[in-house]
Regions:
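A structural "domain/chain start" motif
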Residues: 1-37, 42-52, 114, 135, ...
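Second-shell loop/turn segments in exported
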Residues: 19-25, 121-131
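Surface-exposed short loop/turn segments
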Residues: 42-45, 56-126, 136, 140
Length: 150
């Protein structure tokens, strides 16, 4: 361990475009780019393509929700909550080992992550802004998952 929380045995990571099981298109590209930027900015790992990498981080967006939290007297939404749920798998391409130590009832090799944010359209906050906030939070959570457990 280098003292930074990341494994010194890993030098490169491949992050292919996340899959998207929802009807909201384009979010998978935004999330993939955000994860790649987080890896470049916060870890000692270099991004590499496909089989040139030591490890591969894959993800699947399984749910995107926009829920109304409050309405005005005309039943217009005043406060909304936007959330995205993804499953992420990080594997060592040299050994086939899963690098995530978390176990999940859905699929043991996938780690579910969910994050959410609220926004208020009446005061000028948009769904695009809320989407970017959630994507940035998810990217941070995903890269946090890549740290070596104590």
């Amino acid at each position: 361990m280098l003292g930074n929380g990341y494994s010194p045995d890993i030098k490169t990571v491949s992050v292919p475009i996340f899959e998207n099981d929802t009807y909201r298109r384009g979010v998978e590209y935004q999330l993939t780019e955000a994860v790649q930027n987080e890896i470049k900015n916060r870890t000692p790992y270099r991004l590499a393509r496909g089989s040139d990498a030591d490890t591969r981080l894959t993800g699947r967006i399984v749910q995107i929700r926009k829920d109304v939290l409050g309405e005005n007297n005309d039943d217009d939404p005043r406060q909304l909550q936007y959330s995205i749920m993804v499953r992420v798998t990080w594997e060592n391409l040299r050994t086939g080992e899963l690098l995530s130590q978390k176990e999940v009832p859905i699929a043991p090799e996938a780690v579910p992550l969910i994050t959410q944010t609220g926004f208020a359209p009446e005061v000028g906050q948009s769904q695009a802004t809320a989407t970017q906030i959630v994507i940035d939070q998810l990217a941070r959570q995903i890269v946090n998952m890549m740290e070596v457990p104590w």
